[in-house]
Amino acid sequence: MPRRRRSSRPPVRRRRRPRVSRRRRRRGGRRRR
């Protein structure tokens, strides 16, 4: 029974993160506490 070729590391669930501009977020977050 041939073994299936798979990556050694287990499957990892990727978190979906909305695209946010770091510059804008930092400025807004700092100003609006």
Swiss-Prot record:
Residues 1-33 are annotated as: Disordered. Protamines substitute for histones in the chromatin of sperm during the haploid phase of spermatogenesis. They compact sperm DNA into a highly condensed, stable and inactive complex. Testis. Its main location: nucleus. GO terms for molecular function: DNA binding. It is found in: Nucleus; Chromosome. GO terms for cellular component: nucleosome; nucleus. Keywords: Chromosome, Developmental protein, Differentiation, DNA condensation, DNA-binding, Nucleosome core, Nucleus, Spermatogenesis. One of its GO terms (biological process) is cell differentiation. This is Protamine TP14.
